């Protein structure tokens, strides 16, 4: 029996609260069960030096965890004087995922920074970050159109992510912390709304997994992401 009695293919309750803060062009509080992440999208005119004069935009991301988002306090990375490898890996993943959602040429020379701050962690913080940041990004792009800075919206479609894994020999979707810490296989999957794969990060923590198990996990992820995308679209429709 999984925590909260979920079936193996069932994601946790997903909530997306838009306009959570007042200053950012897009802001969303995303909740995957007890995992809560604040995602903001900020627009700046101009692009990084390596893109100047090319007539296209850029999307980047930063990720961080509040000191007491976990069971025991972790010092802020600013206090340590440098970002950890995990943080850099996750924020690059978020940026790659969200660049796949946008026509960067149609964006023009704007940079959008997605800030994902974990308020409470109970597994799946990176997948929640991608899911919430996509909605914040959609709101920010809508503002560019509403303000007359873009003629057409460069958003190509929604992007969402979910964790899957093998726990106690069974393939399950959207792992909570207690499952994640005991998983034999742990995988994060990012997809477009039509089921195309953007990224798969998979690791055998114990016993190596088979090709058949990989296909099972990808199918579980697709089903979970379809449900999450429906929640994203419902949030944007309100």
Swiss-Prot record:
UniProt keywords, alphabetically: Nucleotidyltransferase, RNA-binding, rRNA processing, Transferase, tRNA processing, tRNA-binding
PANTHER family reported in the protein's UniProt record: EXOSOME COMPLEX COMPONENT (PTHR11953), EXOSOME COMPLEX COMPONENT RRP41 (PTHR11953:SF0)
GO biological process assignments: rRNA catabolic process; rRNA processing; tRNA processing
Name under which the protein is recorded: Ribonuclease PH
Entry function: Phosphorolytic 3'-5' exoribonuclease that plays an important role in tRNA 3'-end maturation. Removes nucleotide residues following the 3'-CCA terminus of tRNAs; can also add nucleotides to the ends of RNA molecules by using nucleoside diphosphates as substrates, but this may not be physiologically important. Probably plays a role in initiation of 16S rRNA degradation (leading to ribosome degradation) during starvation.
Gene3D superfamilies (UniProt xref): GHMP Kinase, N-terminal domain
InterPro entries, alphabetized: ExoRNase_PH_dom1, ExoRNase_PH_dom2, ExoRNase_PH_dom2_sf, PNPase/RNase_PH_dom_sf, Ribosomal_Su5_D2-typ_SF, RNase_PH, RNase_PH_bac-type, RNase_PH_CS
Family: Belongs to the RNase PH family.
Catalytic activity: tRNA(n+1) + phosphate = tRNA(n) + a ribonucleoside 5'-diphosphate
Molecular function GO labels: 3'-5'-RNA exonuclease activity; tRNA binding; tRNA nucleotidyltransferase activity
Transcription among keywords: no
HAMAP family assigned to the protein according to its UniProt record, in alphabetical order: RNase_PH (MF_00564)
Pfam families membership: RNase_PH, RNase_PH_C
Lineage: Bacteria, Pseudomonadati, Pseudomonadota, Gammaproteobacteria, Enterobacterales
Lipid metabolism in keyword set: no
EC id: 2.7.7.56
């Amino acid at each position: 029996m999984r925590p909260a009695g979920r079936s193996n293919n069932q994601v946790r309750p997903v909530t997306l609260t838009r306009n959570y803060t007042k200053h950012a062009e897009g802001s969303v509080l995303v909740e995957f069960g007890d995992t809560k992440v604040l995602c903001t999208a900020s627009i700046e005119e101009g692009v990084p030096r390596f893109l100047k004069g090319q007539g296209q935009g850029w999307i980047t991301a930063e990720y961080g965890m509040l000191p007491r988002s976990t069971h025991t306090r972790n010092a802020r990375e600013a206090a340590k004087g440098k970002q950890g490898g995990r943080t850099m890996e996750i924020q690059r993943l978020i940026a790659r995922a969200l660049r796949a959602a946008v026509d960067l040429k149609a964006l023009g020379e704007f940079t959008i920074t997605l800030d994902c701050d974990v308020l409470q962690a109970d597994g799946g913080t990176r997948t929640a970050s991608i899911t919430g940041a996509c909605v914040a990004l959609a709101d920010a792009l809508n503002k560019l159109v509403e303000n007359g800075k873009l003629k057409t919206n460069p958003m190509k479609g929604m992007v969402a992510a979910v964790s899957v894994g093998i726990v106690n020999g069974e393939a399950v979707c959207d792992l909570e912390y207690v499952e994640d810490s005991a998983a034999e296989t742990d995988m994060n999957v990012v997809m477009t709304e039509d089921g195309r794969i953007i990224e798969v990060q998979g690791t055998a923590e114990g016993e190596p997994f088979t090709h058949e198990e990989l296909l099972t996990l990808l199918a579980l992820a697709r089903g979970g992401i379809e449900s999450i995308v429906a929640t994203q679209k419902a949030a944007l429709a309100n």
